[in-house]
């Protein structure tokens, strides 16, 4: 099996890589995340996964299309539906395309690791793209190791632990409660 694994970030990769290696599967990571904003956050996450891959002796491929303009155009009419409309499909489709064009026979994604993502939708998209591109989809419910992976990423590997999913709107969501409290305190 020649596995290309879309990697959203280093912390989410830890458990996925460890569990696949325990099965005798050596993934190649694929970094394609044009939904991560602002740019300094994108760079921080990219550098972190680069260092993680070097530490773990993993092959990693970087597709550095930074897509703020496209992201804004695509999601402006439906900010609430951004994950379904843009964030998941654009990254997964590009991963399957790259796999097909570069001789990978199987794809998976670290998006299946997070307990905060739309797991069933991600799985459905991967199954759809698998049929469309003729590349197998390796499904694993990596969520079973969420806390184990989180602990290793943070405490053993000292990886950068981001505070929000990636896009500028998810960063706003991170502060929503604080914004509401500030409105009550200061008016507005």
Spell out what each predicted region is:
Residues 1-188:
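Nucleotide-activated chemistry modules centered on ATP-dependent adenylation/adenylyltransferase
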